[in-house]
Amino acid sequence: MYKRQVIKPAGKEFITPITLSALTSKPVISEFFSQRDGTWHSHVDLGLWADAMVIAPATAATIGKMAHGVADNMLVTTYLSMKVPVFVAPAMDLDMFAHPSTQHNLDILRSYGNHIIEPASGELASHLVGKGRMEEPEKIIEVLEAFFARQQDLAGRKIVITAGPTYEKIDPVRFIGNYSSGKMGYALAEACASR
């Protein structure tokens, strides 16, 4: 599996790009331009290249920027260029995670079709105990594997879905009907098409 990493400048305080690069044998991108030779790092190319994007850990600030399109760093700019499934693994203090602003931003990301990997409960960096720690990397990999395995379960199948109102004849003159926008039918069709 070929991976590329994008790290925010503040993320370098937690893990060095050298460590990430050593783990994947690939360079780490943190700025729009390479500090070594001035080469431009194309967020668009990353968006076209990837099969999925995983943002782990996702801070409250990053989640807020993603939800509202604040493209002030390479990570969020890359996210905004993605045409593939995006998985977000929040990691923050329990009060920050539970805050209505954070929950609202997560709801916005869900409404965009992003997959939220719920944080685990346990001891946090603040030494408090509760929900907010990033899910274990092994669990995140399991979520990705399950997602991509599920994407193939309807391959080659033909499915008929009706959308809109239905009318059932009672007799030659009367019928029973229902009002329907067809939204559920379209949602089912989209879900089947993605699998």
Report the location of each language-model feature.
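A cross-family phosphate/adenosyl-ligand binding-site feature
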Residues: 3-87, 94-182, 186-195
